[in-house]
Amino acid sequence: MPKGIPLTEEEIDRRRHEIFHSSVALILKQGFANTSMQEIAEAAGVGKSTLYDYFPTKDHVLLFVFEEELDILQGQAEDIAAQDIPVEEKLLKILEAQLEYLLNNKNFFTELSMQVMQLGQTGQQRIMKKRYAYQDLLRGVLEQGGREGVFRPVNTRLAARAMIETMEVLVYTTRPTGTPREMLGDVLDMFMHGIKS
């Protein structure tokens, strides 16, 4: 960790966030693979050796960035899940928040997702833990709906995964049938009512 006066965990975390925020534009412009640690250090206004104090490797930068993005999504979903509103509205709001996030961060999320696949096993496991937490939260909403008799009994783990993956399809499809928000309405109608007449 940084030399000299010892920093608290809070100060270290704040500095990591500052480095992250100052390097986002650079990563978006050049791509993560084409951005060097020297360039990240320059964008953050720190020396390369100082950068290594906070992030020992470029993979650590990537992991931190991706975990931060997943934490934002998770935090939004947790806030919605805690609201005292009908479970159908809760589900819709969570999916709308995910869709909005993906639309607002489309290029950045695409770049991060491609690079994360190159991480080692430990990094992959950390990312999967975050993804599973989001899936489990959505699964909890579906199970709440089941207990309340709003949703019929289904494989909630599979349903949650399908809904999450569908949000990405709505953003990245090359054959849209409407705006992403319009397609979300269509997809939710299919999820809620099926396709059988």
Residue ranges and their predicted role:
Residues 45-55:
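Short hydrophobic/aromatic patch on the recognition helix
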Residues 12, 16, 20, 62, ...:
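Amphipathic, non-transmembrane alpha-helical scaffold segments
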Residues 102-122:
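Amphipathic alpha-helical segments used for helix-helix packing
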Residues 64, 78-104, 159-163, 184:
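Hydrophobic alpha-helical connector segments
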Residues 1-30, 35-43, 60:
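Basic, helix-initiating cap at the start of DNA-binding domains
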Residues 1-3, 100, 136, 140-148, ...:
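C-terminal peripheral helix-coil segments that are non-catalytic and often amphipathic
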Residues 71-78, 122-148, 157-161, 172:
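Amphipathic alpha-helical packing segments from all-alpha helical-bundle domains
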Residues 8, 27, 32, 36-37, ...:
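Amphipathic alpha-helical segments enriched in hydrophobic/aromatic and basic residues
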